[in-house]
């Protein structure tokens, strides 16, 4: 019996309903802005490197911004979306995620995935 099967047997004795990721979420890649595009005031953004260096599991405010002009070409996460770093310089940080809980859409950089879903983000 696998570790997952043991946990399910222990915590969910009546079993669990299995769903594919596609049944509860859609996944898209982030945009294409870089650190050089950061500015002091503008559109909130999350750079993939910040996911594992600056953020915890949840965020409702960003650390950085990009200009309106740069933002026009980007992809955005909406409230409750999961933003996942899909690359890193070390294995521990690959696939680290944050749940975006802010009240406005946030631009997401490349090397990130936006997971839009209908689940509780916490």
List PLM regions with ranges.
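Short acidic (Asp/Glu) and glycine-rich catalytic loops that position anionic groups and cofactors
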Residues: 1-3, 106-107
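Non-catalytic DNA-recognition/assembly elements of restriction-modification systems
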Residues: 3, 7-30
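A short beta-sheet element
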Residues: 47, 61, 68-122
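Short coil/turn segments at secondary-structure boundaries
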Residues: 34-41
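Short loop/beta submotifs within extracellular cysteine-rich repeat domains
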Residues: 3-5, 32-33, 53-56, 91-92, ...
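Sequence-specific dsDNA recognition surfaces
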Residues: 22-34, 49-81
